[in-house]
Amino acid sequence: MSLTRLNIEAFRNIQFAQLIPAPGINVIYGQNGSGKTSILEAIYFLGMGRSFRSHLSQRVINNDNDKLTLFATLNLARGDSKIGLRRFRSGETEVKIDGEKVKRLSTLAETLPIQVITPESFSLLFEGPKSRRQFIDWGAFHADPQFYGAWTNVRRVLKQRNQLLRNGAVYTHIQFWDQEFVRYAEQVTEIRNHYVDSLNGLLKGIIGEFLPSVDVKVSFTRGWDSKTDFAELLENQYSRDLATGHTVSGPHKADLRLRVGNLPAQDALSRGQLKLLVCALRIAQGKLLKQQIDKHSIYLVDDLPSELDAQHRQLLLKQLTDTGAQVFVTAIDPAAIVDSLHTPPNRMFHVEQGRVTVVE
């Protein structure tokens, strides 16, 4: 799978741009503020309906416009597919796939699986468990068609349960919701656990490429003691949940644990090593997607030279090339990317003040 055409209109400082990307490695270069990261962001927005730069997501629409428009043609195994998205200043989003209106943004994510390696994506290890749950759930969503419905139900029931707790409901009023909560929580947990097991099968070798002298153990924690019956736990923890006004244990507390020896990876590794570990996780996740559903991810790699030294840039780009996936990578100086590739990039684009030109 690859993007064969991308139109960007009124997105950040890009008034209009049309790109004809190539399969393989696409290098996008330009000075800071030129708009090169906005191209990656537009691709992500088209696949997720939101920005990967969360702190800037309210300013995606160009100041002179009342809406942004993104359009892409995808080359899929079954033929070409066309995706279009409009976002209005009101917050309304309109999505079409092959001319048909789409109501759920999850349909976008299913159609256009995207992996991101940016300065922000390193929060996967530097911050709390939320980003690691999202990492697991990205894979579980693509691997198992039952996951989205089960997780949607977990969130629905959890919201209702927490509202009852805040209202001081007696346990008999919560018990009905707990029966549903347990059923969907166990379904979500089983899918997540199976996914992490599958990921582990690939991870060891890939981590070994990036960090050959480090033994990283990866495990999944479900959000409650695996030896404890979840229904009994919810009943036994009712008083505690009532006091806090929310559900203390459950699949919404799950985590992906990465350890080196007896220490969390965050404490045992340097910041540079942690970045390499995140790269390994992203590569493994993309490879597993290809194995499970025979679909490539599209990789978006932002500002690579500032994040990794020359040796590790070369290693990451080799790993990305070996996946066979389409890759978009940005840099201020294109030589920092080109010199790290074993073969010339498939296509290069120069961005200046929001204007994009292909470099022959």
Swiss-Prot record:
Q: Which keywords, in A-to-Z order, does the entry hold?
A: ATP-binding, Cytoplasm, DNA damage, DNA repair, DNA replication, DNA-binding, Nucleotide-binding, SOS response
Molecular-function GO terms, alphabetical = ATP binding; single-stranded DNA binding
Instruction: Name where it's found.
Output: Cytoplasm
GO CC annotations, alphabetized:
cytoplasm
Q: Which Pfam families match?
A: SMC_N
User: Which example biological process does GO assign this protein?
Assistant: DNA replication
What InterPro entries does the record tag this protein with? DNA-binding_RecF, DNA-binding_RecF_CS, P-loop_NTPase, RecF/RecN/SMC_N, RecF_2
| PROSITE patterns per the UniProt record, alphabetical | RECF_1, RECF_2
Task: Kindly list the positions annotated as binding ATP.
Answer: G30, Q31, N32, G33, S34, G35, K36, T37
* Family membership: Belongs to the RecF family.
> Could you tell me what this protein does?
The RecF protein is involved in DNA metabolism; it is required for DNA replication and normal SOS inducibility. RecF binds preferentially to single-stranded, linear DNA. It also seems to bind ATP.
Protein name, per record? DNA replication and repair protein RecF
